[in-house]
Every structure is written in C-alpha cells, then in structure tokens.
Amino acid sequence: MIVSFLYFSSLFPTSLRKINLVAGEKHKDRRMKPSLMDSLLGLLRIRIKRGVNLAVRDLNSSDPYVVVKMAKQKLKTRVIYKNVNPEWNEDLTLSVSDPNLTVLLTVYDYDTFTKDDKMGDAEFGIKPFVNALKMHLHDLPSGTIVTTVQPSRDNCLAEESRVIWSDGKLVQDIVLRLRHVECGEVEAQLQWIDLPGKGL
C-alpha cells in the first residue's frame, strides 16, 4: 500500500502534492476545532413587552428603547417616541451555549444630537427556565405552573415569576425592576426554541 502511494504520488508535480497536503491539513484543523454550532444548546427568544413608569429624560417624556446583552451578543428594540409607558411587543432572539450566563437588559432614551441617556438596567438568569425545560414535559393542561422564581438579591424581579406550560410550550413571564434609576419596570417573556440535532 505504501509503495503504491509513493508510486502514484510521483506521477503528480511537487507543487500539486504540496497543495493537496496543505488542503488536507486545513481540513483536519477544521474538524478538530469545535464551532459555535457544536456548543449551541438552542435559542432564547425574549419578548420585550412593555415598559412601566419609565424615567423622564427629555422635557416631559422619554424616547425609550431596550438593549439586551448576553456574552458577546447584543440586540435592541425600536425606539418609541415620547412615551414613558411604551409597548414594544418585540422579539429578540439570543443563541445559548451556556445556561449559566445572565442576560443584561438596559433601557436608553434616544437623543438625536447627544449621547443616549441611560434609563436603568436589570439582570436576570435563565437557569430556572432551562431547568424546567430539562424536565421534557408534554401534554400538560395549558396554564399549568411548572415552577416559580422568587424576587431576591440575586435577581431584579419586581414580583414572583412563573414558568408556565402554555399552548404546548414553556414560557416564563418576568417583570424586571430597573436599577440605577429613580423608577421604571420592564415586562418580558422568555421562550425556548429548539434547533435540529440540538437540545438540553
């Protein structure tokens, strides 16, 4: 087998044999290096519902929008003008590879000519929601409470949060009290999206 390989390789120019060798090495490296898709568990869809009693940053109102960050990912909603009780009802979808990471939500006031004003932030973990997903529940009556998360120093929940089985899927409604600001809350909902070949 070795003799045969050497014989056939001698039929090709040296430069072509080098190209094949380099291509083979690159292919080997690509197989050995884990990609983002390999570590991906699924997608977290965060529906930013609305803001309640947000801080005033302009003359009599604010132009708020929400920025959501997790690890190196950053997404934002549209701006709603002149409203301290805005309704976004907008979905922001993050890829999740580590369920221990927290999500940072920050509200800003949009300004045309100056730097956008910060209107508070809140942080929350997704571990309780992920743990409920790992139960692999099926065929529960819609509205069944699977688990609850209490407000504590470790989260920014304004009230008890429930993970609920709703229309064939798990969702978690959360009300976040904003920090580093005089007032304001943001209501959101978490939902998990499975990917083909992936899972918890």
Swiss-Prot record:
Entry keyword Nucleus: yes
UniProt domain C2: residue ranges: 22-142
SMART domains xref list: C2
Pfam families per UniProt: C2
UniProt keyword terms in alphabetical order: Abscisic acid signaling pathway, Calcium, Cell membrane, GTPase activation, Lipid-binding, Membrane, Metal-binding, Nucleus
Entry keyword annotation includes Nucleotide-binding: no
Residues where Ca(2+) 2 binds: D58, D63, D109, Y110, D111
Gene Ontology terms: biological process: abscisic acid-activated signaling pathway; positive regulation of abscisic acid-activated signaling pathway; positive regulation of GTPase activity
Cellular component aspect of the GO annotation: nucleus; plasma membrane
Binding site residues for Ca(2+) 1: R57, D58, D109, D111, D117
Cellular location(s): Cell membrane; Nucleus
One MF annotation (Gene Ontology) recorded for this entry: phospholipid binding
The organism's place on the tree of life at top rank: Eukaryota
Consequence of gene disruption: When associated with disruption in CAR1, CAR4 and CAR9 genes, reduced sensitivity to abscisic acid (ABA) during seedling establishment and root growth regulation.
Protein function: Stimulates the GTPase/ATPase activities of Obg-like ATPases. Mediates the transient calcium-dependent interaction of PYR/PYL/RCAR abscisic acid (ABA) receptors with the plasma membrane and thus regulates ABA sensitivity.
Assembly and binders: Binds to PYR/PYL/RCAR abscisic acid intracellular receptors in an ABA-independent manner, both at the plasma membrane and in the nucleus.
Family: Belongs to the plant CAR protein family.
Protein name: Protein C2-DOMAIN ABA-RELATED 5
Source species of the chain: Arabidopsis thaliana
